[in-house]
Design a protein with these regions (language model features):
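Specificity-determining recognition surfaces
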Residues: 1-35, 42, 49-50
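Alpha-helix boundary/capping residues
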Residues: 15, 40-43, 69-73
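Short secondary-structure capping/turn segments at boundaries of alpha-helices and beta-strands
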Residues: 38-44, 53, 100-101
Length: 119
């Protein structure tokens, strides 16, 4: 198998986080989820310590509770910033609007994955 470094560089330099275009109806298989966690495990850690634990949440009630906490802690700020920047062309306008959208719809995502670090 060949490795295309140009394509890798292109992907790493053009791929941004996706918040507004999430497919909230699409299920995430266990296989895909585990593949994503496996890839994320390759990220460096301080002192090369493996101190991460992954919490996978599919339960709608738990997702709703987490979403409510998330909105309680920062949702109002995101909403206010989104309204303040709307139509200004500010370089953070799209990011804040997308973050505000995600905060409003967080419990609708098929699965939440929280990474914890201990030590």
């Amino acid at each position: 198998m060949s490795f295309n470094t140009n394509e890798t560089d292109r992907l790493l330099s053009t791929t941004r986080s996706v918040k507004k275009r999430l497919d909230l109806e699409r299920e995430v298989s266990e296989e895909v989820l585990l593949d994503c966690i496996e890839i994320a495990e390759q990220a460096p850690t301080g002192g090369n310590q493996s101190s991460r634990r992954w919490l996978v949440i599919r339960d709608p009630k738990v997702k709703k509770e987490i979403a409510e906490l998330y909105r309680e802690m920062g949702g109002q700020f995101l909403k206010e910033q989104s309204e303040r920047l709307d139509g200004t062309g500010h370089h953070n306008e799209k990011t804040i609007k997308a973050s505000s959208y995600l905060a409003e719809h967080l419990e609708e995502v098929p699965v939440l994955v929280l990474v914890t670090i201990y030590g």
